[in-house]
Every structure is written in C-alpha cells, then in structure tokens.
Amino acid sequence: MVEQDPFEIAVKQLERAAQYMKISEEALEFLKRPQRIVEVTIPVEMDDGSVKVFTGFRVQYNWARGPTKGGIRWHPEETLSTVKALAAWMTWKTAVMDLPYGGGKGGIIVDPKKLSDREKERLARGYIRAIYDVISPYEDIPAPDVYTNPQIMAWMMDEYETIARRKTPAFGIITGKPLSIGGSLGRNEATARGASYTIREAAKVLGWDDLKGKTIAIQGYGNAGYYLAKIMSEDYGMKVVAVSDSKGGIYNPDGLNADEVLKWKREHGSVKDFPGATNITNEELLELEVDVLAPAAIEEVITKKNADNIKAKIVAEVANGPVTPEADEILFEKGILQIPDFLCNAGGVTVSYFEWVQNITGYYWTLEEVREKLDKKMTKAFYDVYNTAKEKNIHMRDAAYVVAVQRVYQAMLDRGWVKH
C-alpha cells in the first residue's frame, strides 16, 4: 500500500514545478485546491430486496481550459484524497496534451466483485442521478477507470439521456462507451498506441536509427501491456524479451509473441511457465539489460532501492506513478531518458477526447484517422516536454509539469481569475 497521502503528493509535485516557472503566489494557491467537490449518497436496492447505501465522489479540479474530464473508479478503499489527487493529475494530463479540457475524477466506495450485474446497473444509474446537476457534455465528461468498463458507461449514458430527455448529443456525456452507442475506434489500444509514439520519438532524440531489433521489457500484461507488446513487436520490429503480471514474469532473449503469451495467460491465469521462456520475478524484469523498460502495472516499482540497477536507456511510464521522486533523481543522473506517466499514458484520454469530438459533431472517423491524429498529438506533446527539459536542464517529469501548469495558469490569467 502507498503510505503517503495521495493529495499531499500531488500538491508537492505542483510546488516543485512552480520553482521552474514564473507563477504568482495567488495562482499557486488556487491550483492547490479543487474548484468543486461533490460527495453523494446512493441508495441501491440489492437483489435480495434489502437496500445498501453507497458513498460516491466527483471532483472537478480545474476548468480554466474547458470542461473537466476524468474516469469513475469503483474501489472498496476509495478515498476523497485519492480522487482529488487523480483529478489534479488529470488537469495536468489534459493540459500537457493541449486538449480543451480541465481535470476531474469520480469514485464510489464499493467492492464491485460483490455485486451482481443488476446491482451494478442500479448503482451506475443511481450515481448519475446523484451527480446529474454537475455533469454535461460541456461541463464534465466522465469515463471508465478502475473496475468500471464500457457496459457501465452505457448504463450511465442511458440514465443521463433518460433524465435529460435528449438523444444524440448526450452521447458526448461519457466516453469509453461501446462502439454501438458512440464509442470510438482505437479506444482499446489507445494507451499503448500513444505510448509507442513517445517511445519512437525518445529513440530519435537518443540518436537511434530506428527500433528494429531493439529490446523491450514490459512489467504488467493487462490491456496496456499486451497492446504495447503487440505494437512494439509488430509495428516497430522490437524484441519483447520479457513481460510479467502480478504472479511473476517470463524472459526469452529471442523475443516473445504477444498473442501467444496472452492466450497462455488466459488459459493458465498467468504468463508464468510460458513454453520456451525462463520464469523471472517482477524485480528481476525491472533490472534486465534492455533498451526500453515499460512499467505498465502498479505504482512505485522503481524506488531509491533499485533505481541504480536499472539498465534500460528509456523508461516509458505506461502505469501511473511507477517511479518515486527519489528514483527520478537517480535515473536523471544516470542519463536515462524517462517518459513521465502523464505524457506516456495520455493516449487514453486523447482518444476519449476524439470520441467526444465525434459524438458532438456526429461524424465518425476511421481507425487510420484516429491513429494519425493520436500520432500528431503525442509527438507534439513529447517535444513540448523534451524541449522544455533541455532548455531548463530539468528532468522530463518536472518539464511535463512546467508545460502543463503554464497552460492552465495562462488560461486562468486570460479569464481574469488571477493576476500576474
């Protein structure tokens, strides 16, 4: 478990970024607080006829740049502090990608594994009824997150439409929906696809001709880990030499086939014991001699204890918060190029934005168009951050914060909310 209070960490990161830029004291004070916090009580009738009461949150952190955007988490240990921190990080993520959004996040304290599908539907609809007054396609646009999925988004969108008595434009009230009701092509692969573009550009700035034959190790084999393995091997010719899940990892210096490993994981519950590969631990995977390391699982896996042993030349943070602040310093001193999480994994929110644009306009794009537009967005964001890091001689995470906070600050100045 993470020991520190998540929102305290978010505020410290903001204060650190402020050292590298010109920002007024009042603006910094403003940015340390969410603009709106909503806490709701949701009564849900259970299948046995009893009623259970759940607590839900929606935090709209900052809307200077546009409607707030962010996922809805269902977690038994959800806290308001976590939701506030994640809403702050969404604010910086949408800003670094230059999307016309602010940041938001939602959560319900619930163990979804203990609910039937009917109970989940009633909870989803109850949550929308409770927060209806503070969301709209032009005010706050939720999306799936931990333990929520396209089906839950579909129920939520349907409930919103039922209350609003509106049809098509209300598709844009929520993203991450099934394709049949306004979802976007390319959403499933979006996080990994976006990360692949940043890895490609990182290789260029390191002077590599291309990625063909280069090696990558991926910690985590969920949606993002699997798609990243598939894309890096099939589209870029990289060798995926190691992957892992929560039970352990596998290594094969000749490379692993992404689809075969996924099939094995589905049949056996883990990637472990995959034929032709050697079993390794998650800790060993991180310290392999590879060109690219992609932590795509949980937070705080590269710490001051193991940062010195990292041998990769590029660390692509596909997961949220996989590297601690102390480890950041060590990797920077070692000359390792880090692609910080809220740049590296921003493909997801960017394609969510594309979904919203398609909903609002009623014009839908091909998969090729989605990928091409994502490529342009990710590449521009990468160089915005990389050039700032070079110019100020700071590491990539600090640079990403500087780029993002500067954009939010500028919007606040232009609106007259704060002064220079």
From Swiss-Prot:
SUPFAM superfamilies according to UniProt: Aminoacid dehydrogenase-like, N-terminal domain, NAD(P)-binding Rossmann-fold domains
EC number: 1.4.1.3
Main subcellular location of this protein, as a coarse class: cytoplasm
Positions that bind NAD(+): G220, Y221, G222, N223, A224, G225, Y226
Record-linked Pfam families: ELFV_dehydrog (PF00208), ELFV_dehydrog_N (PF02812)
Record GO terms (molecular function): glutamate dehydrogenase (NAD+) activity; glutamate dehydrogenase (NADP+) activity
Keywords: Cytoplasm, NAD, NADP, Oxidoreductase
Residue numbers annotated as active site: K105
Keyword NADP in record: yes
SMART domains in the cross-refs: ELFV_dehydrog
Superkingdom in the source lineage: Archaea
CDD domains documented for this protein: NAD_bind_1_Glu_DH (cd01076)
Gene3D superfamilies cross-referenced by the UniProt entry: Leucine Dehydrogenase, chain A, domain 1 (3.40.50.10860), NAD(P)-binding Rossmann-like Domain (3.40.50.720)
Gene Ontology BP annotations: glutamate catabolic process
Localization in the cell: Cytoplasm
Catalytic reactions on record: L-glutamate + NAD(+) + H2O = 2-oxoglutarate + NH4(+) + NADH + H(+); L-glutamate + NADP(+) + H2O = 2-oxoglutarate + NH4(+) + NADPH + H(+)
Disulfide bridges in this chain: none
The keyword Manganese is assigned to this record: no
Gene Ontology CC: cytoplasm
Family per similarity comment: Belongs to the Glu/Leu/Phe/Val dehydrogenases family.
NCBIfam families: GdhA_Arch
Assembly and interaction partners: Homohexamer.
The name this protein goes by in its record: Glutamate dehydrogenase
Species assigned in the record: Pyrococcus abyssi (strain GE5 / Orsay)
Organism phylogeny: Archaea, Methanobacteriati, Methanobacteriota, Thermococci, Thermococcales
